Amino acid sequence: MIRTRSASAWILALAALTGAATPARERVVDGDGIVDATIAGVRGRIRIEPSGTAMPLVTTAWAERATLKPGMLAFSYAVGTERVHGRTGVAPIDLGTGPFKRRIGWTANPYTPAADGVIGPGGVPEDVVRFILRTPVAGERTVALPTTDQGGLAGGWGELYALIDLGGQPLRIRFDPYHARTLATASAAARIAAAQGGVLQGVVEKVEIAFGIERPVRTMTLARPLTVGPLQFATLGVRTADHGSTAGIADAADPIDPDEIVVTAKSKKPGRDRLSIGADLLARCSRIVFDKPARQIRLTCA
């Protein structure tokens, strides 16, 4: 999640985003999602990914090659309790269909070693972004989910989320085919467990989230599968130390084994309740379509 560090500069940032090229109707993203791009005419490689932020996040090396000038608005990207700090500047970026101006963020640590930067569907100029994950198969269903940004001052710079109803309240869903496991923040896991009968099991593992930062994760199994569009599943990972806690919030009639915690607490900060659908579940899906004018994400899965 991107957070600003200078709220007073927000109005200036909005003014700097004028002059973008007329958007094309649709962009198709397939394969590894990596495309040749330029920033201020300087070449690099950027990955367009469903879970990427609208503000391109690139390496300091690329920003320096492009002689980007940092503005007064810095940012930080929260990965659990850790933060990656960066700088921003406005420059023309070309993803292969013509240049447009965009505020660009850069960090010393790369978001991914696979490319010089990443960008999400909210940051490309096309109205519709179609991610092709694999060849369609018989029996697939397409379900449209409403979408939202992360909200707050940096809402227009962050990720685009799908929304589902969980216990009468919205739960934010992101789609990340570049990470193996489906993961929930601790507060999201608490809500899911309360609604679906969840139990934490097994040992803590370290899982890379972004920027090479690893966070502790345990496995949760559900008595009643969770539905996200055409997907149903009963197993997911829980980021036990991130945005909430799974410790000390159990509510069960029977004694609780230390390695099996029944989580029933409700989150007090719903904005931090996020579920990231990983490659383990997206392997069932052939495409994800972000339709920005319709404010929909359409997920097609078997």
Residue spans for each PLM region:
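Pepsin/retropepsin-fold aspartyl endopeptidases
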Residues: 22-302
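Hydrophobic h-region of N-terminal signal peptides that target proteins for export
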Residues: 12-21
